[in-house]
Amino acid sequence: MKIVKESLAGTFESSDLLVKVAPADGKLTVVINSEVIKQFGHQIKQVVNDTLKELGVQEGTIIVDDKGALDCVIRARVQSAVLRATDGQQIEWEKL
């Protein structure tokens, strides 16, 4: 999927996260800010990267501000932000 505009998904509430997505040419940059980065940073990065790979995102800037969200919430917020930022092409729901 190609990211063509900026988008947001989520909140700053406890047990949630805010995902910001923006277009970027040629590279994929993922920035993760979390209150629990020392304990769960590797797992958060893994879930975000796996979700982006499943969606076919190869370039863009992804900023994740985590407040202790579970994996399923991370996945859902990343999916929502990316889908809002795409060019409206047909979504392949079976990949999600």
From Swiss-Prot:
Keywords for the protein's UniProt record, in alphabetical order: Cytoplasm, Phosphoprotein
Source taxon at top rank: Bacteria
Record gene name: citD
Primary role: Covalent carrier of the coenzyme of citrate lyase.
Subcellular localization(s) per the UniProt record: Cytoplasm
Subunit structure: Oligomer with a subunit composition of (alpha,beta,gamma)6.
Protein name (record): Citrate lyase acyl carrier protein
Residues recorded as bearing O-(phosphoribosyl dephospho-coenzyme A)serine in the entry: 14
One GO cellular component term: cytoplasm
Keyword Cytoplasm: yes
Pfam annotation, one family: ACP
Similarity remark: Belongs to the CitD family.
Keyword Plastid: no
